[in-house]
């Protein structure tokens, strides 16, 4: 499947991603370099470029929905889902949804956390494209994919704006296809 998922005009999209990120050193804690997408979101043309690329991936993958990982994944997945004519499934941080919920705990590069999904959101066998801004260690993305699979979905791919390859996130996702609009090596 991942060989079939090609970003149209990939070089231009990758350049847009690179130009739209800003590094914030020692945030949220010392030793972490936070990848801030605020400049990309503030630039209407850049934002439209990445949203259209994600929508194209959703259409090409045969997804029936797009899931966004809180919080920055929401900003990308919701408009991409709308543009592709698909539903949007929010994968939330723990404690943000009313019961009943499905829950998955995971490790971050700077701590631990949990993700939740409203029970009943996903129909058995539905195909979902999972979207987030950055793939770093893969903990958050893996937890989101496992949560969606537990709910009955088939994850067709994980799509991210930026993959930080040296942090080794892709192998932690197993056989799930990963599409990065730009990979930092």
Swiss-Prot record:
Pathway: Purine metabolism; AMP biosynthesis via salvage pathway; AMP from adenine: step 1/1. Keywords: Cytoplasm, Glycosyltransferase, Purine salvage, Transferase. GO terms for cellular component: cytoplasm. Disulfide bonds: none annotated. It is found in: Cytoplasm. PROSITE patterns: PUR_PYR_PR_TRANSFER. One of its GO terms (biological process) is purine ribonucleoside salvage. InterPro entries: Ade_phspho_trans, PRibTrfase_dom, PRTase-like, UPRTase/APRTase. Its EC number is 2.4.2.7. GO terms for molecular function: adenine binding; adenine phosphoribosyltransferase activity; AMP binding. It catalyses: AMP + diphosphate = 5-phospho-alpha-D-ribose 1-diphosphate + adenine. It holds the Pfam family Pribosyltran. HAMAP family: Aden_phosphoribosyltr (MF_00004). Homodimer. Catalyzes a salvage reaction resulting in the formation of AMP, that is energically less costly than de novo synthesis. This is Adenine phosphoribosyltransferase. It comes from Kineococcus radiotolerans (strain ATCC BAA-149 / DSM 14245 / SRS30216).
